[in-house]
From Swiss-Prot:
Gene that encodes it: mtnN
Gene3D superfamilies: Nucleoside phosphorylase domain (3.40.50.1580)
Family note: Belongs to the PNP/UDP phosphorylase family. MtnN subfamily.
Protein known as: 5'-methylthioadenosine/S-adenosylhomocysteine nucleosidase
InterPro entries cross-referenced by the UniProt entry: MTA_SAH_Nsdase, Nucleoside_phosphorylase_d, Nucleoside_phosphorylase_sf
Recorded GO MF terms: adenosylhomocysteine nucleosidase activity; methylthioadenosine nucleosidase activity
Keyword vocabulary terms for this entry: Amino-acid biosynthesis, Hydrolase, Methionine biosynthesis
Length: 232
């Protein structure tokens, strides 16, 4: 099936490999975002470098959807691993996405749920299946599960313990996916999150992140490129 694929990464390092693979790319710079609209391996692709954090990701995702009209969204990049089976370089694939820093439980909502939105944003099952298949084919260790987002870099035992208490099944944490998922939900556009682990979230995760971000970017980009071949 020929689809146009929207790909979103927060940082330049997370989209650089994909950007270098693009041909016939038109560049759109708007509101602090960079959008590259072209092709990778004969697949129509719109690649967004959104900037870091949920607001930047939401702004960028909405602009990407409006300006380039992709059929589906893949969120790529790095994440902090909380699942015991995840190590640096491994792949995490979303089965659900939630905000970990939203709290309107005083009004009867679930932790992480925002009014007029579901508690969890569910990715497209076909996209999840394609991601799992390509990860297995590439030989990466992968975990599929809950990815939680917040406007905080998670390191330190206290933060980790709080997130695990609120979301016992959390596999990984990062800073954009829930915002991207929420915008996709609003626009009724299918999505999936496919990220590689740059750090195992602990008190030294900020040091690990700097060291292993290039590996995470490489591995997550490899899976995204493999996924594209399913839609050419």
């Amino acid at each position: 099936m020929r689809l146009k694929i929207g790909i979103i990464g927060a940082m330049a390092q997370e989209v650089e490999i994909l950007r270098n693979l693009m041909v016939e790319a038109k560049v759109i710079e708007i509101a602090g975002c960079k959008i590259y609209d072209g092709k990778i391996n004969n697949t129509q692709v719109a690649l967004l470098q959104s900037g870091i954090g949920k607001v930047a990701a939401a702004v960028g995702t909405a602009l990407l959807l409006e300006l380039t009209k992709p059929d589906v969204i893949i969120n790529t990049g790095s994440a902090g691993g909380l699942d015991a089976n995840l190590n640096v370089g491994d792949i995490v694939i979303s089965t659900e996405v939630r905000h970990h820093d939203a709290d309107v439980t005083a009004f009867g909502y679930e932790k992480g749920q925002l009014p007029a939105n579901p508690a969890a944003f569910l990715p497209n099952e076909q996209l999840v299946s394609v991601a799992l298949k390509e990860t297995q084919t590439a030989g990466f260790n992968a975990v599929s599960g809950l990815i939680c987002s917040g406007d905080v870099f998670v390191n330190g035992a206290e933060k980790i313990a709080q997130i695990r208490q609120d979301f016992p099944n959390v596999a990984a944490v990062e800073m954009e996916a829930a915002a991207i998922a929420q915008v996709c939900h609003a626009f009724n556009v299918p999505f999936v999150v496919v990220r590689a682990i740059s750090d195992v979230a602990d008190k030294e995760s900020h040091l690990s992140f700097d060291e292993f971000l290039p590996l995470a970017a490489k591995n997550s980009s490899e899976i995204v490129v493999a996924m594209l071949n399913n839609f050419a």
